């Protein structure tokens, strides 16, 4: 009977977890939560990194330069959540990292509900009320938001009831030293595992576990029992510390330079909105953490009833202990201040924030902490009344469970989004193993990184950290919690190359080229990946970066164009650069299909983004006074043909190759695409390497200026293709 009861409870919370996350579960293999960039990428990367560090000689789990390269970051305060790594490591090879993470979500939520139910039952709360209270604890907005954000550290709220349950076992068996010793050892291991999930659980557990431990000391029958309780408590703490030293982050915590941190200001600490957030649930997936309309109203109703109609009918003094534990988390949960009648009132969290030097910055998480004691208070109060009538007990328990489920809005689908687009070229990078391939870094563009306290650039480019699991190389982009500001802040404006590649500083060609020449070989950099979709194809920035890189053929060469990504291999790379010869469309004829996928291999400055006009892929020129194209050809002479059309008024066009003019200038009309032919002598082609073709036109027109559209671009010539035909 006892086993069946536990099995039913466990299945109940498992089903509830699945219902609460049904929408992401339906898309578990392809999507993650949210409709804006969340933290999913670095939680997945964390587990890849742990496996990589454990299986690669010379690496340390708690130190890395694989993100925010070239700096080495102490990961002692990073959210590694190592407790969950074994489950991920078991599942990831079988089902992939996305599905494995969803299994962690379900496991964490189920354990949270089940352990809360165990605690309520041990505190003599009726089964039905315990199910309702534990469900309220499991289905808080903070828990569901944690699923959406992949914050598996915040999701592991089962540690709070687990620690109380374990201490209760020590107290219950205190007269049997061997049993108590075993439970103390288990508690020490549990404290260690809790710390390997998230350090803040030690802070949270102190608000519940210390008062509960004091209660058991008071309730102990003899001073010898109290002495043993203290001894076993010390033993558990010592065991935790020993394990953290030899198999955890403690040595790295002690060497961590806290002066390098950049904590957020108090005003940014996310508290529960006062007063609405204590009596309603709203904007959960917009990062608003609330208590909802069940927990606090039911607790207040129970308190009022206890002081009035139930004052003489319920004589259970222990329930007041649990109610008292609600007070401190409740006061801390709104954050640094609240607004009452237009007056700002400073709250106690301000002192706590300052005491911890801003290390704890999410006071709204105290909301989950107060639910456990609140539900025990409610359950112990009403249980005395309900146990007298089986029908009333069933009806009340059912209504409370239904109220929790309705309040949790289970059937509202959680926002989801596809994970960052997969690319085959990252897998090819990942196949490059051994010396010297293991040494290079991948530079993602736009450049962006952060620490959870400060950021350089937008969040979306940081998502490229997810690709690190595929290519397995060092990279700049990404996020490491509480990384020193010095590791990445210079990317903002101070560094000409990285600030320009992050779209925060204008291009300074000489400075950027100098830095590229030094860093490609010193860091070294193996590949530079330009994410055109993130930069934006509309506007000059994308063409500026691609065009500039194409002017440095001795340093960079395009090797992959896939989807919205253009990948440049550097001169350091052992595999070298392939020839930049356009596709041969027929024997002896090579064509650059302007506007088609892959033309990024050839285009320089002056081109606008690709377009499809009447089924033809084209680009407009005109952004610069001249427009360049870069390519290689087999040695020899060629006839160059260009398909072009002018915008708004005829244009005079001259063509140059390697700055040498070809033939006479031609006039390009506005009527339709026309073909213009030029002769390219063999002596200009030379060995065929690093050729530059320039379109030199006599002006441009902005469509908006001539009332043709709202287009603000400078348009000169529309080009469909450029062909090179053998011409002896």
Regions found by a protein language model. Give the residues of each.
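Membrane-embedded helix bundles of polyisoprenyl
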Residues: 13-16, 104-123, 128-218, 232, ...
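Membrane-interface coil-to-helix junctions
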Residues: 16-112, 140-145, 151-157, 271-275, ...
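Membrane-helix boundary/interfacial segments in multi-pass membrane proteins
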Residues: 33-36, 146-154, 264-267, 272, ...
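Extracytoplasmic
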Residues: 402-589
């Amino acid at each position: 009977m006892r086993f069946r009861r536990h099995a039913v409870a466990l299945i109940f919370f498992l089903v509830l977890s699945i219902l609460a996350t049904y929408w992401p579960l339906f898309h578990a293999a392809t999507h993650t939560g949210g409709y804006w960039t969340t933290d999913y990428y670095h939680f997945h990367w964390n587990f890849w990194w742990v496996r990589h560090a454990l299986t690669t000689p010379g690496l340390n789990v708690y130190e890395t330069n694989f993100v925010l390269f070239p700096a080495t970051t102490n990961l002692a305060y990073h959210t590694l959540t190592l407790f969950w790594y074994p489950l991920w490591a078991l599942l990831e090879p079988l089902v992939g990292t996305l599905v494995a993470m969803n299994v962690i979500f379900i496991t964490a939520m189920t354990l949270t509900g089940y352990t809360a139910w165990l605690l309520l039952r041990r505190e003599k709360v009726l089964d039905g009320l315990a199910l309702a209270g534990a469900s309220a604890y499991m289905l808080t907005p903070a828990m569901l938001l944690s699923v959406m954000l992949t914050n598996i550290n915040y999701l592991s709220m089962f540690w709070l009831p687990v620690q109380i349950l374990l201490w209760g076992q020590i107290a219950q068996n205190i007269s049997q030293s061997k049993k108590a010793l075993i439970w103390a050892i288990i508690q020490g291991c549990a404290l260690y595992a809790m710390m390997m999930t998230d350090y803040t659980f030690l802070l949270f557990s102190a608000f519940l576990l210390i008062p509960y431990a004091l209660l058991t000391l008071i309730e102990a029958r003899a001073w010898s029992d109290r002495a043993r309780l203290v001894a076993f408590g010390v033993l558990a703490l010592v065991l935790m510390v020993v394990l953290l030293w030899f198999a955890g982050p403690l040595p790295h915590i002690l060497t961590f330079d806290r002066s390098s941190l950049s904590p957020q200001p108090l005003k940014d600490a996310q508290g529960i909105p006062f007063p609405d957030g204590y009596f309603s649930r709203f904007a959960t997936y917009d990062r608003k953490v609330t208590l909802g309309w069940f927990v606090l109203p039911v607790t207040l109703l129970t308190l009022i009833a206890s002081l009035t109609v139930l004052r003489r009918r319920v004589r259970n003094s222990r329930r007041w202990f649990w109610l008292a534990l609600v007070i401190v988390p409740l006061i801390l949960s709104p954050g640094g201040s609240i607004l009452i009648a237009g007056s700002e009132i400073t709250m106690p969290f301000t002192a706590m924030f300052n005491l911890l030097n801003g290390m704890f910055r999410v006071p709204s998480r105290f909301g989950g902490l107060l639910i456990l004691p609140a539900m025990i208070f409610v359950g112990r109060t009403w249980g005395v009344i309900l146990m007298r009538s089986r029908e009333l007990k069933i009806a009340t328990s059912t209504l409370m469970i239904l109220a929790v489920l309705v309040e949790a809005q289970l059937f509202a689908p959680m926002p989801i989004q596809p994970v960052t687009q997969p690319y085959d070229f990252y897998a090819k990078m990942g196949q490059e193993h051994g010396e010297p391939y293991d040494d290079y870094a991948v530079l993602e563009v736009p450049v962006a990184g952060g620490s959870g306290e400060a950021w350089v650039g937008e969040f979306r480019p940081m998502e490229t950290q997810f690709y690190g699991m595929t290519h397995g190389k060092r990279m700049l982009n990404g996020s490491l919690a509480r990384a020193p500001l010095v590791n990445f802040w210079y990317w903002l404006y101070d560094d000409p190359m990285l600030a320009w590649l992050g779209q925060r500083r204008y291009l300074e060609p000489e400075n950027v080229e100098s830095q590229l020449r030094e860093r490609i070989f010193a860091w070294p950099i193996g590949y530079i990946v330009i994410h055109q979709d993130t930069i934006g194809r509309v506007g000059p920035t994308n063409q500026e970066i691609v065009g500039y890189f194409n002017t440095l053929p001795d340093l960079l060469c395009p090797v992959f164009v896939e989807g919205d990504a253009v990948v440049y291999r550097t001169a350091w790379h052992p595999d070298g650069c392939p020839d930049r010869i356009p596709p041969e469309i027929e024997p002896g004829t090579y064509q650059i299909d302007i506007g088609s996928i892959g033309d990024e291999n050839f285009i320089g400055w002056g081109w606008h983004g690709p377009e499809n006009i009447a089924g033809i892929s084209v680009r407009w020129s005109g952004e610069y006074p001249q427009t360049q194209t870069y390519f290689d050809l087999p040695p020899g002479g060629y006839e160059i043909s260009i398909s072009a059309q002018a915008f708004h008024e005829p244009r005079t066009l001259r063509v140059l190759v390697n700055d040498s003019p070809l033939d006479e200038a031609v006039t390009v009309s506005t009527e339709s695409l026309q073909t213009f032919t030029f002769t390219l002598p063999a002596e200009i082609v030379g060995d065929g390497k690093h050729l530059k073709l320039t379109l030199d036109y006599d002006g441009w027109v902005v469509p908006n200026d001539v009332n043709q559209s709202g287009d603000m671009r400078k348009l000169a010539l529309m080009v469909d293709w450029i062909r090179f035909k053998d011409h002896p």
